[in-house]
């Protein structure tokens, strides 16, 4: 079972269930959205972690904000705290243009509306942050190894370009 499968099956599928309730989508749509978003979000994190200037602030956001509690309690993903942490991570990792392209690509690939995708991105980023934080805290792996394993190809720029090509294509 891969890391993405571990994330999706955490809590016996409670994450997918929470997203279906929170956004009024089906389980298949939630799974598709997570499966599309996580590699691209991880790619952005991977690029930021490789940048020595940004690495420490991103690591601090991931490891000091209590994010692992969201991995353990998916029902809290809709809380104001979860949304605030997800938005903070997103703004630290992506510029506005890259985030807009990512959201458009995810909407196109999953068939979800752009409003739902834009609302889901901070929640999925919080989920990803919690998953990373929890696994790194266990001491079994490094943040960069986890992010690298979850990232799609060459990172966010490649993911955004690939998604943009599919949208405009």
Predicted regions and their residues:
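A structural "flexibility-hinge" signal
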Residues: 1-169
């Amino acid at each position: 079972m891969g890391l993405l499968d571990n994330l999706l099956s955490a809590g016996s599928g409670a994450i997918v269930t929470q997203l279906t309730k929170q956004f009024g989508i089906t389980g298949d749509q939630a799974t598709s959205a997570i499966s599309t978003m996580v590699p691209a979000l991880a790619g952005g994190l991977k690029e930021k972690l490789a940048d020595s200037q940004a690495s420490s602030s991103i690591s601090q956001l991931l490891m000091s904000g209590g994010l692992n509690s969201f991995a353990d309690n998916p029902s809290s993903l809709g809380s104001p705290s979860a949304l605030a942490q997800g938005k903070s991570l997103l703004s630290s990792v992506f510029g506005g243009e890259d985030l807009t392209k990512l959201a458009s690509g995810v909407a196109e690939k999953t068939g979800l509306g752009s409003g739902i995708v834009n609302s889901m991105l901070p929640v999925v980023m919080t989920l990803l942050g919690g998953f990373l934080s929890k696994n790194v805290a266990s001491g079994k792996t490094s943040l960069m190894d986890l992010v690298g394993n979850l990232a799609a190809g060459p990172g966010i720029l490649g993911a955004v370009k690939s998604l943009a090509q599919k949208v405009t294509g």
